[in-house]
């Protein structure tokens, strides 16, 4: 059974439509209006082996905040919907990803309890047209709307482009592991019996 979800969200600030296939091949069709953000989402899809269609119209004449944050909200909702009842999946995933001088850690728990721990200090205000402070806002929105515990930590800092890209790719690899089926897991991986 294909684990796929489509979610739309329309406000006065943004109009977003996302389709996510957790069992895809890494194909992406992206249009957020922020080139560097599209590049990061493309890396997320490719390295997580997710198929991701993401069409966003946002109030970029104001700034990128609503576009990035609301995309995170909708992506998180799509992840939650696509994962479904969580039967038979690993639930946990982690990855440490190198990118040249940079080393990023990401750990995911699809617990149903939202939480973000984000440890990274950027040294420039923007990479391309993306405000670096919005990277944390994006992951916060994803974690809370997906109901996931998400830890992202920069173990070795360097070029800000590399840092952000390493985070998105580490998140992709960790999430791919968390949503993967494990033949040893019967039912839901929790002593409570539900997540």
Predicted features and spans:
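N-terminal intrinsically disordered, cationic/polar leader segments
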Residues: 1-195
């Amino acid at each position: 059974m294909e684990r796929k979800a489509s979610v739309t969200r329309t406000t006065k600030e943004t109009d977003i439509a996302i389709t996510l296939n957790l069992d895809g091949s890494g194909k992406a069709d992206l249009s957020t209006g922020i080139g560097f953000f599209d590049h990061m989402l493309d890396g997320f899809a490719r390295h997580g082996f997710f198929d991701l269609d993401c069409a966003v119209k946002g109030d970029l004449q104001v700034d990128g905040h609503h576009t990035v944050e609301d995309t995170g909200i909708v992506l998180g909702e799509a992840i939650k919907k696509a994962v479904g009842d969580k039967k038979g999946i690993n639930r946990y995933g982690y990855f440490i990803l190198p990118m040249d001088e940079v080393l990023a850690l990401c750990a995911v728990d699809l617990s149903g309890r939202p939480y973000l721990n984000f440890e990274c200090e950027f040294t420039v205000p923007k990479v391309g047209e993306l405000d670096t402070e919005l990277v944390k806002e994006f992951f916060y929105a994803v974690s809370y709307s997906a109901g996931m515990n998400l830890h992202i930590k920069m173990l070795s800092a360097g070029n800000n482009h590399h840092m952000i890209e390493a985070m998105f790719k580490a998140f992709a690899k960790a999430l791919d592991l968390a949503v993967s089926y494990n033949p040893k897991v019967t039912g839901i991986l929790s002593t409570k019996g539900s997540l």
